[in-house]
């Protein structure tokens, strides 16, 4: 039995950048034999006493390298998002065998893609390797696009107010028509683990008022019952309106924890990783308890510091020109049970004279509803 791990990074992020995100660090920690696949992606193979026990795929974020075949799809479902989803899907289709396990991990828009990929895999099934040549990448990508098209057509939450429906329908005429025999069922996914899923996905388009909106949203709020565990690390301090998080509807085995700092102070990528190291320190043992193999000797030492300076992800152009909206954390979402817990680092940070870089602004957790009277509002 092999565990297959797909790691989907955030916008503009790559594995080899000087300050890797938590997604790249998790992939690196998995160890094994790592090879440069193509177009910014990497694959890993971990064997123990002979048999392969874990394989991994790292995919860079939107706005990095890409495959020309996907350009029309990207114009339809958002730059790079479809490519991340389909490349993760074809990797799993190429390697998965019945009885194997799957873990999917993502950050930011890669988190939205991870959640969508999980629903795609358990909802549509993986490609049947008996009906095509998995090593022929172009053939695999075309079949992956066809499978994604078929799945997307049946998921109303994947397309809202899309002005591009006609383009997508035309795309459906250019890819193979797949039948149920072209798929193999996947009974379960062990875990989906995400850092700060953002809900604005798709093609930026003009909106009244002059700022960029998004054509549709792809991150579902319901985690499939075939996904056994969901882990979500959320930012308390991110304030960009179009980076508002997409929560999961509460159910058993979903854990959503709020951490201090901005979007990238949770998902990583800054030269000062003091805050993002805490979210990673929380995520790794959760994944390990559900099948992920990793060795911290494969990455730099983690040094979380809850009172370290944070960062203002929205302080530079073009984000500084777009609307701001403080995060909201309702005590329940969708009428369900308590949706969140507050990490202990929030309590350590609350009331301290900490700064947000580059602006000298204190974090105020009472203002966004995490604390009242000095006590956390969540378990």
List each language-model region with its residue ranges:
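Active-site- or binding-pocket-proximal scaffold segments within functional domains
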Residues: 1-379
